[in-house]
């Protein structure tokens, strides 16, 4: 069975509609409901696509002015991202039930203090020092904050005398992480299990509203008894500790002002809030930083796993691949893992309408596809099987971290039952749930990167890319190595996006003998996200170039047919019939196209000359076997062959050169491949027009007449534009448009 692209518009299957479609709920033809297992049917509720679309819409609502409500149970990952990255408004649920729940918990603690009860963290020391006792809970709170303010931070904003080995600011966390942590800690405290006052939660909201954010050390948490040290800097800001630094004011050149928390609070008319009783411990004993960084990571990860499917669809088009690899029978019927089914369905639908991908598979005879690749290679053909498990792991992690932000009880110790007054000593601060979510997310990101790297390196390799030039060069390859550097860079990216594990060490007098390292794991996942984004941006850049080259090929081949027809008539028309001319043209066209596919490493003139020379064997075979009349003189025939070859070579070379020039310099418009692409078209057009990454090759075409960097920016600068569009969320709106 071979492949035929002659009926691209026909439906592959005419099956009943499936349980869900491109938006996660609407059926799409081809995926048969009766074929799905029970596990697969749950995908309608938990697909990566539906979660991505829901999160995107929610985030847009917050960006457009909707306030995030802190009520202890409805905080979403999108809400964390909105507060952390877009300074969205935050309001507390001030309903009587919620406020009473907090009040009862605080009263329970006050009663224990007044009666002299022994309660961990109020009358005892901490961790391995819990055998000490004191009746001074206020001073104990100061001692707690003091011993946790141990992080390394820049001591000055002035330039260093000696150039640092790394960014001097890389010892502190990004503000987004800290804002997210404040929000999540508020959401935990408002549940009323921590014995704190309502006014403390209000003060934390006030910090967010004023955008006064503590400078928090990047390192120092093992996320065992919560993220103790990072959270202590939030507590230090609340009380106005003059030694705690905070960000404040408008951003200048991307950097905000830094000042003493005491001075900045006064500048913003915010009263310091002295902490009482259990409140220092209530702030510190929690997983807020781990959950914040994890939530921000997953908000990006779920986008990237969908973008990977879009890249795979575009790669299928660029490599003239087949949609049949994603047929419903293979996935929804034969092996219905939910992630695999979702991935196959998405790619199947994205390829709809493509004039490059082969949309149908037909039976052909053995001799018709002899010596041709029978099927797509693994990076395309098995992409649903490879990406599917990653989708499932990211969905699972998404749900776990959402739960961590909400539905678990407070994550400090002890927990206070306001209804009974009981205190419960446990370990909800142990953030292993977040760690596991991040480990599986990071492993998933690595696998996504590995798949896309394999697709990318196949696309730039002339031995594998089905007739594209080496390194997707738009001009003569002897002086154009366009994507060769990218092939190396993407290898580096996928190597750096390693899922390397975290290593637990016993800590704090062996009291914390096991610890989750959740924040460390989440930080590593953020790094993996950044590296994977670099890889995806590079691949998208290569894909757009490859699609333009395919469009050029689609224009060149009809032009070549005209040249063959006209030169056959000129050289052999006097002694060949119309039928013979037609047959000969078919033979020559087949031979020339086969030659062009195998000679993409040659420069244009040499390539067309050797292509024309292959006509000798075709012509000899034709005149020997067809019984065609030939000129009485063999010299006349040889002269006709020579004239034909020379004219074909010259005209073909000129045609290719003209098309190259028109494509490179925009005479065909900024998006010449649009007419050939399926539903991935908006991504290609966004890159080419909205962010202005045009086809590469102008400097090479003009033989570097003006030097480097005059006619075009560097390859890396163009990829940086794509990278930034992914990181700042602009690409998300394009991906939504593909599926919504």
From Swiss-Prot:
The keyword Signal does not apply. It catalyses: L-phenylalanine = (E)-cinnamate + NH4(+). It is an enzyme of class 4 (lyase). The keyword Nucleus does not apply. (E)-cinnamate binds at residues 285, 375, 381, 413, 484, 508, 511. GO terms for biological process: cinnamic acid biosynthetic process; L-phenylalanine catabolic process. GO terms for cellular component: cytoplasm. Gene3D superfamilies: Fumarase/aspartase (Central domain), Fumarase/aspartase (N-terminal domain), Phenylalanine ammonia-lyase 1, domain 3. PROSITE patterns: PAL_HISTIDASE. Its main location: cytoplasm. InterPro entries: Aromatic_Lyase, Fumarase/histidase_N, L-Aspartase-like, Phe/His_NH3-lyase_AS, Phe_NH3-lyase, Phe_NH3-lyase_shielding_dom_sf. Belongs to the PAL/histidase family. This is Phenylalanine ammonia-lyase.
């Amino acid at each position: 069975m071979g492949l035929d692209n002659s009926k691209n518009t026909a439906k592959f299957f005419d099956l009943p509609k499936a349980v869900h479609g491109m938006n996660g709920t609407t059926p799409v033809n081809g995926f048969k409901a009766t074929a799905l297992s029970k596990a697969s049917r749950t995908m309608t509720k938990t697909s990566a696509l539906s979660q991505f679309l829901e999160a995107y819409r929610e985030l847009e609502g917050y960006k457009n002015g909707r306030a995030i409500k802190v009520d202890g149970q409805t905080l979403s990952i999108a809400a964390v991202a909105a507060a952390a990255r877009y300074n969205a408004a935050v309001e507390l649920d001030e309903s009587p039930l919620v406020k009473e729940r907090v009040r009862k918990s605080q009263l329970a603690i006050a009663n224990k203090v007044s009666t002299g009860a022994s309660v961990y963290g109020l009358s005892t020391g901490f961790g391995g020092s819990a055998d000490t006792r004191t009746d001074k809970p206020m001073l104990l709170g100061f001692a707690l904050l003091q011993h946790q303010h141990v992080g390394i931070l820049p001591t000055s904003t002035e330039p260093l005398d000696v150039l640092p080995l790394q960014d001097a600011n890389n010892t502190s966390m990004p503000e987004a992480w800290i804002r997210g942590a404040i929000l999540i800690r508020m959401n935990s405290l408002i549940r009323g299990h921590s014995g704190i006052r309502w006014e403390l939660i209000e003060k934390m909201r006030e910090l967010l509203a004023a955008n006064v954010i503590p400078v928090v050390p990047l390192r120092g948490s093992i996320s065992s008894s919560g993220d103790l040290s990072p959270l202590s800097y939030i507590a230090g800001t609340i009380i106005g500790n003059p030694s705690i630094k905070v960000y404040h004011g408008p951003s200048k050149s991307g950097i905000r002002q830094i000042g003493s928390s005491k001075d900045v609070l006064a500048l913003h008319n915010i009263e310091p809030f002295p902490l009482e009783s259990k409140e220092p411990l209530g702030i510190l004993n929690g997983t807020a930083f781990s959950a914040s960084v994890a939530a921000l990571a997953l908000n990006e990860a779920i986008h990237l796993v969908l973008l990977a499917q879009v890249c795979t669809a575009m790669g299928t088009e660029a490599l003239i691949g087949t949609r049949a690899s994603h047929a419903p029978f293979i996935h929804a019927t034969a092996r219905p893992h939910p992630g695999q089914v979702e991935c196959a369905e998405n790619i199947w639908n994205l390829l709809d309408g493509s004039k490059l991908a082969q949309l149908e598979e037909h039976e052909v005879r053995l001799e018709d596809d002899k010596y041709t690749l029978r099927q797509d290679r693994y990076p395309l053909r098995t992409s649903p099987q490879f990406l599917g498990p990653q989708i499932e792991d990211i969905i699972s992690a998404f749900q776990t971290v959402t739960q961590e932000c909400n539905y678990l009880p407070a994550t400090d110790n002890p927990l206070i039952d306001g209804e009974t007054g009981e205190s419960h000593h446990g370990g909800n601060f142990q953030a292993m749930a977040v760690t596991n979510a991040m480990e599986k997310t990071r492993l998933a990101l690595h696998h996504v990167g590995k798949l896309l790297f394999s697709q990318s390196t196949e696309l730039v390799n002339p031995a594998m890319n089905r007739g594209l030039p080496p390194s997707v060069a738009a001009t003569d390859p002897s002086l154009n190595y366009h994507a060769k550097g990218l092939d190396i860079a993407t290898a580096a990216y996928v190597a750096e996006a390693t899922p390397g594990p975290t290593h637990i060490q016993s800590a704090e007098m062996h009291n914390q003998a096991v610890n989750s390292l959740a924040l460390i794991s989440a930080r590593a996942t953020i790094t993996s996200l950044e590296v994977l984004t670099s890889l995806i941006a590079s691949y998208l850049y290569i894909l757009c170039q490859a699609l333009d080259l395919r469009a050029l090929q689609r224009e060149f081949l009809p032009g070549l047919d005209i040249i063959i027809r006209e030169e056959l008539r000129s050289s052999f028309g006097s002694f060949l019939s119309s039928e013979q001319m037609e047959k000969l043209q078919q033979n020559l066209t087949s031979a020339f196209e086969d030659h062009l596919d195998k000679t993409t490493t040659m420069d244009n003139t040499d390539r067309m000359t050797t292509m024309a020379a292959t006509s000798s064997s075709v012509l000899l075979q034709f005149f020997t076997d067809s019984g065609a009349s030939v000129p009485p003189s063999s010299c006349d025939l040889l002269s006709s062959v020579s004239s034909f070859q020379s004219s074909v070579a010259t005209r073909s070379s000129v045609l290719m050169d003209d098309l190259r020039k028109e494509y490179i310099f925009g005479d065909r418009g900024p998006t010449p491949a649009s007419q050939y692409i399926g539903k991935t078209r908006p991504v290609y057009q966004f890159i080419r027009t909205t962010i202005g990454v045009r086809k590469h090759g102008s400097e090479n075409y003009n033989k570097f007449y003006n030097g480097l960097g005059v006619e075009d920016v560097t390859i890396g600068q163009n990829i940086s534009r794509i990278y930034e569009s992914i990181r700042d969320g602009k690409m998300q709106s394009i991906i939504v448009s593909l599926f919504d």
